[in-house]
Amino acid sequence: MFIEHPLIKPKTLEARLYQQIIAANALKKKTLCVLSTGLGKTAIAILVIAGILTKKDGKVLILAPSRPLVEQHYNRLKQVLNIDEDKIIALTGKIQPKKRAELYKKGKIFIATPQVIENDIIAGRINVDEFILLIADEAHHTTGDHAYAFVAKKFKDKCHILGLTASPGSDIDKVMEICENLGIEHVEVRTEDDEDVKPYIAKVKLIPIRIDLPNEFKRALKLINEALKERLKILKDAGVINSIADVTKTELIELNNKLFSYDEEVKYELIKVCSEALKLMHAKELLESQGKSVFLNYINKLSMQRTKSAKSIVNDEKVREAVNLLMKSDVEHPKLGKVVDMVKNILEKNKDERIIIFAQYRDTVEKIVNLLTQNGIKAIRFIGQANKEGKGMSQKEQIEAIERFKKEGSVLVSTSVSEEGIDIPSVNYIIFYEPVPSEIRFIQRRGRAMRGEGGKVYVLIAKGTADEAYYRSALYKEREMKRLLKNMCYLLNKRLQKKFEEKSKEEIKEETEEIKEKEIESKTAVKEETKEEEEKTKKPVTILDFIKQIEVKERSKSEEDKIKQEIKIPKKPIKIIVDVREKNMAKLLHNYANIELKTLEVGDYVLSDRVVVERKTAEDFVNSIIDKRLFSQLKNLKKVEKPLLIVEGENFSRLHENALKGAILSIILDFGIPIIFTKNAEETADLLIKIAEKEQIKEKRTVMVRYGKTAMSLKEQQKFIVESLPDVGGALAERLLKHFKTVENVFTAKEEELMKVEGVGKERAKKIREVLTAEYEG
């Protein structure tokens, strides 16, 4: 059976009762839908879109976390929805911002990554009021500072909401945060244990495969462990940890943060030792779980770092011995050979079988793909976009990789980028190169095998290593999440109901107070009207008075209608150019200024044609002094006419007080750059707005990037020349040019003529003429 609906093409969407029930409930309230992988979250989204658009006229936005997933939703909606295909639009960062602004006017349904929508909200390219539905696919991302959360908060009070996820997590407070950010009023949950979904769930068998490490690895790991224990002993002797046994990375990260509050005499050495211990622990895990090449790459990266902790590890005798031992050995991690053997065995039984291998690191993905290819197996790489090292796949390459895998590939070797939502049908075998401690990622990886007829999931575990702990952790968290999901509907809906009842009480209270205020205003107005009427009765009413009354009523009505038609996003009086890397600050600023995101060569914020601001957090300020980046950045900042440095926060504890004072004095005296300290991001934003207002409103200066390749327009050049005159700012330069028409006329004008311009007194006119006529003494 198929769904029959005027907005859904015939025989394109299978009719499943549980999907229809969930969609019907989701149309009544803002809903978070938690549905196991393979149960058709996209189908529910389509049913809700069709339902909403049948009742209301407006636009729909679907958020998806990756570009390939955006493309997938786009193709599926075009295939199923009975809507003009030109009205269904996929938006990515590849489309120019101006073009996106035009597309928002033309389209009906938009599919985009949250980062694109976030940028367009900040820059004022999208009108949120035009949307009647927001669908957040993979809604578990709607937490913290994620772009999902920013977009959700902008939309939740404006339109209907549907959140979709297979794995919201095992912490009910985190799930409540997701609900809060999306404005969720109701939760729908279905797991593989629910009777109405059981017929559609594929059975998956989880098979752990434990692998012994080679002797060369064990000897190298022993040396790294000894180096690690030396650091942990220092921390224990200092009394900051209780034992050197079973210390976790999480505990060391927490300790590192605590150490900043310790006395100056001891904290720097302890922070260094703690940082070394963390790096050694990470190196150890890489060798245990990933292999020799990934471990050696990490040590090589440390050798290129300037920090004391990195140098200490690279120069450590035991670490050097471990590195030499591995470099001389031809042995690689036995997981690699095991993967090749497993793939061969599966394909020998069925040459048309499809297999997905998940590996956490890109280096490991490359290694696996190369090994499989050498063994005559068609392996396709699937990784995320370019990172700091420049490696990665473009959106086009990702989509092509999925299509190749569907048509001709036997094995897809992937990082976590393919865990979410990518439609790869009929996959019966999954191999985890390593276990992941996150229950969300564990479920999503395994879920790739729940879409076909069911299958097997193999997890490779290096015996006696962190792999064992991560595997146990993932299983425990998954059990906890399932337990939570069973009670989630009841618990969450109860919490949400309580929350909305409290909100309603508050709203009723506010409304009551508002009504009382209006009653008082109304009584006052009635008294005044009565008084006016009494006065009018004293005068005879003429036909002219009657006509005037009708004209006033008609005019006020037509003006009201005109206002309703012309309501748009209010234009903000100032503009700020913000560097693309400063997006969090742009989020704070966009409510008060028009924001243009741009890659800036110098500084972080352009507030006018002469003021450019570099912003640093206290931590970054300290780090940039230590690694000597700061002074090269300040040399660049000197390119602008009026540079400014803002340092935000109060945590300067990593740097000695004398060194900090010396750096501040050098910035002010040697570089001539003013420095302002702020407590937090909000205070910084307020300061930036005030400077921009002064420059643009009071001084009437334009906002432009004056350094680099950008050339000034003729008008800007004229203004720039006139501003060079004594006591002439941006506003006065503009008045002089408007009065005299040309720069030449300004420069040849006599004192009396200059004084005719507002703001030019006798003294100022005299100074201007003196500069223009005095002989140059070379």
Curated annotation (Swiss-Prot):
Residues that hold ATP according to the record: L35, S36, T37, G38, L39, G40, K41, T42
Gene Ontology MF terms: ATP binding; ATP hydrolysis activity; catalytic activity, acting on DNA; DNA binding; nuclease activity; RNA binding; RNA helicase activity
Keywords: ATP-binding, Helicase, Hydrolase, Nucleotide-binding, RNA-binding
Catalytic activity annotation: ATP + H2O = ADP + phosphate + H(+)
Matching CDD domains: DEXHc_Hef (cd18035), Hef_ID (cd12089), XPF_nuclease_XPF_arch (cd20075)
Enzyme Commission no: 3.6.4.13
Motif window: DEAH box: 137-140
Any one Gene Ontology BP term: DNA repair
Helicase ATP-binding domain span: 22-186
SMART domains according to UniProt: DEXDc, ERCC4, HELICc, HhH1
Domain Helicase C-terminal stretches: 338-516
Homology family: Belongs to the DEAD box helicase family. DEAH subfamily.
Protein name, per record: Putative ATP-dependent RNA helicase MJ1505
